[in-house]
Amino acid sequence: MNGRYSPTRQDFKTGAKPWSILALIVAAMIFAFMAVASWQDNATTQAILSQLRSINADSASLQRDVLRAHTGTVANYRPIISRLGALRKNLEDLKQLFRQSHIVSESNAAQLLRQLEVSLNSADAAVAAFGAQNVRLQDSLASFTRALSSLPGKASTDQTLEKPTELASMMLQFLRQPSPAISFEISLELERLQKQRGLDEAPVRILAREGPIILSLLPQVKDLVNMIQTSDTAEIAEMLQRECLEVYSLKNVEERSARIFLGSASVGLCLYIITLVYRLRKKTDWLARRLDYEELIKEIGVCFEGEAATTSSAQAALRIIQRFFDADTCALALVDHDRRWAVETFGAKHPKPVWDDSVLREIVSRTKADERATVFRIISSKKIVHLPLEIPGLSILLAHKSTDKLIAVCSLGYQSYRPRPCQGEIQLLELATACLCHYIDVRRKQTQCDVLARRLEHAQRLEAVGTLAGGIAHEFNNILGSILGHAELAQNSVSRTSVTRRYIDYIISSGDRAMLIIDQILTLSRKQERMIKPFSVSELVTEIAPLLRMALPPNIELSFRFDQMQSVIEGSPLELQQVLINICKNASQAMTANGQIDIIISQAFLPVKKILAHGVMPPGDYVLLSISDNGGGIPEAVLPHIFEPFFTTRARNGGTGLGLASVHGHISAFAGYIDVSSTVGHGTRFDIYLPPSSKEPVNPDSFFGRNKAPRGNGEIVALVEPDDLLREAYEDKIAALGYEPVGFRTFNEIRDWISKGNEADLVMVDQASLPEDQSPNSVDLVLKTASIIIGGNDLKMTLSREDVTRDLYLPKPISSRTMAHAILTKIKT
């Protein structure tokens, strides 16, 4: 029994449904997909950044190309136009990307984009103006340079305008750094040239025409170049790029947080789903366990359906419980609520377990403290149940109140370690135990009803037979009275030597026998109220042992052997005493020489019903009283008729045929059975099966009357008992009976005491204290005094009238009255 999950009632009310688990799975998948999916359009963002970088590059290239075109290094304006086209395309692409991206709606990106567009438009206009004016400027410069170079003398210049003339120098200086002063000087110089004579008019006209154009266009071109060079397009593009990166970074942080949240939610939902599935699986397992438990209850009920004995049914049921809880052993004890001792014990295996009394007392005390509680403990198996082959390990012990008078204690033993079972498993064990106890109680009540029914049937039959026999017996008594009266008169009227006198004597003798038979019939027909009480068969036999001895001839030896188990039955000890006397007398009458009669008391278990000569004995537990002899035996033809009234094989020797008939009647009154087995020439055995009782046995004195125990006159009684407590108890009993007790621990101590000249009137020796080489029958020879041997319940006690002065055996426990009669008998003899 492991630690299984046991859902509570609330778990079943709030448990997840399959559709809810499916919904949670879908939600977890959605959250997981959202956690791993891309939220931002990374491709768009990267394209925006790429376009911004292209704008930066194209803007720088445009400024370079404009500068080169301004200096005249490049005469082709196609690169400038292509750069402008690229910038316009980049701007349009950027607008399209911004419309696709959510960044436009965030922060200052849209405003920066508009500023970039304005900047590009301004640059575009400046480049267009630059292109037109720079072409004209370059043409004017070329014409001006050619005209200036064609002038002779000091004013002439070469193709590179590097001739050291004043006009060329001033123009070159103006080209480098335009200023109004230089422009004014150049204008004066041009006017001077126009007024100068002797110069070629065509170059002078060209200089006069192109010079002012250069002076007016060059500052404008310079301004346009400066405007293009100082354009904020690249700066705005970089600002927009930084803004995009910042927004992108913030969005990444938010996205990462959202991803973490969604991932965590997905993982949490997955864990919750796993928990729900686990609990659902556990609840399913628990429901399956409950179904198995229902099958267990059915199987336990099946065990009690047949005619099997209660012990066999309980044993089969315990095996089912043991298998259900995966245990190695299983035992059940029904403990008396008040006396705290096991009334009945059952085990999954045979023989029955022997429970530790201290454990039972402790658990009964715990159960009585709170009658509503179930006591549950886990302790060592060796501390609970003692078996021939003990199971090492731990045992689960469960106790609860079964009835008003009984407490059920169930033990499950395990060879290996097992975790503490859950509350649900404990409840199942309690319910299974309660179910088993219920069936045992029902079977017990059925058995009691059957016993009462048999007793009632027997009583009614006896009443009917007794009424008939009583009427007949009274009529025969009257007839016999007349016959015997007249026979006695006739006897007195004839002489002693007469043959008639002898015939009359035969008539009187036969009449006396008839009177004896009629007396027995009248005894059977008397309506006496039976006293039914629980009593111990062993104690009864111990009490009547001297009476049995006196009722038998001196050539017959009696031996007794008692089992250690309880032998309590319900009925009248007087009837059982009559049964023993009748059977023992019949056995002694079947012996011609020295004979032996053995009386054995034990417990018997009948697994199946048994067919007897006089009925069918059902299975179950019984107290077995066996009486066997070594006589001549009973012939097979006679055996079926021995319990019939008036059947006898000793009609000529005074047999009435009512002795065994009364035995059968008494045993039927006990609701018992008799099984007789006999072998001619070897002896006969009477096995009397009596139903046991779980009640506390009463003292036999309550039936036989408490006679005053005989007292002594200070005689010395030596006692050998190794148990200190038991020796003190015996000494107190002996002193209370009027004797002087002298106690010894060992047999050697009393032998040394006697060897020193001390004498005792009687010696009582516990058989356990005898040396191994010392026979109990030779104790009185060693100690040279009368002795009584005290033994256990399994002591073989021999009583022989010839040997009564030599040995006497008393089985434990010994009552004060039995001890008093035994001591008095030995001292007197």
Curated annotation (Swiss-Prot):
<dbReference type="Pfam" id="PF00512">
    <property type="entry name" value="HisKA"/>
</dbReference>
<dbReference type="GO" id="GO:0042802">
    <property type="term" value="F:identical protein binding"/>
</dbReference>
<keyword id="KW-0808">Transferase</keyword>
<dbReference type="InterPro" id="IPR004358">
    <property type="entry name" value="Sig_transdc_His_kin-like_C"/>
</dbReference>
<dbReference type="Pfam" id="PF19443">
    <property type="entry name" value="DAHL"/>
</dbReference>
<feature type="modified residue" description="Phosphohistidine; by autocatalysis">
    <location>
        <position position="474"/>
    </location>
</feature>
<keyword id="KW-0192">Crown gall tumor</keyword>
<dbReference type="Pfam" id="PF02518">
    <property type="entry name" value="HATPase_c"/>
</dbReference>
<dbReference type="InterPro" id="IPR001789">
    <property type="entry name" value="Sig_transdc_resp-reg_receiver"/>
</dbReference>
<feature type="modified residue" description="4-aspartylphosphate">
    <location>
        <position position="766"/>
    </location>
</feature>
<feature type="domain" description="Response regulatory">
    <location>
        <begin position="716"/>
        <end position="827"/>
    </location>
</feature>
<dbReference type="InterPro" id="IPR036890">
    <property type="entry name" value="HATPase_C_sf"/>
</dbReference>
<dbReference type="InterPro" id="IPR036097">
    <property type="entry name" value="HisK_dim/P_sf"/>
</dbReference>
<comment type="function">
    <text>Activates VirG, by phosphorylating it, in the presence of acetosyringone or hydroxysyringone.</text>
</comment>
<feature type="domain" description="Histidine kinase">
    <location>
        <begin position="471"/>
        <end position="694"/>
    </location>
</feature>
<keyword id="KW-1003">Cell membrane</keyword>
<keyword id="KW-0418">Kinase</keyword>
<feature type="transmembrane region" description="Helical">
    <location>
        <begin position="19"/>
        <end position="39"/>
    </location>
</feature>
<dbReference type="InterPro" id="IPR045812">
    <property type="entry name" value="DAHL"/>
</dbReference>
<protein>
    <recommendedName>
        <fullName>Wide host range VirA protein</fullName>
        <ecNumber>2.7.13.3</ecNumber>
    </recommendedName>
</protein>
<dbReference type="InterPro" id="IPR003661">
    <property type="entry name" value="HisK_dim/P_dom"/>
</dbReference>
<keyword id="KW-0812">Transmembrane</keyword>
<keyword id="KW-0902">Two-component regulatory system</keyword>
<keyword id="KW-1133">Transmembrane helix</keyword>
<keyword id="KW-0547">Nucleotide-binding</keyword>
<dbReference type="GO" id="GO:0005524">
    <property type="term" value="F:ATP binding"/>
</dbReference>
<keyword id="KW-0067">ATP-binding</keyword>
<dbReference type="GO" id="GO:0000155">
    <property type="term" value="F:phosphorelay sensor kinase activity"/>
</dbReference>
<keyword id="KW-0614">Plasmid</keyword>
<dbReference type="InterPro" id="IPR005467">
    <property type="entry name" value="His_kinase_dom"/>
</dbReference>
<dbReference type="GO" id="GO:0005886">
    <property type="term" value="C:plasma membrane"/>
</dbReference>
<keyword id="KW-0597">Phosphoprotein</keyword>
<keyword id="KW-0472">Membrane</keyword>
<feature type="transmembrane region" description="Helical">
    <location>
        <begin position="260"/>
        <end position="280"/>
    </location>
</feature>
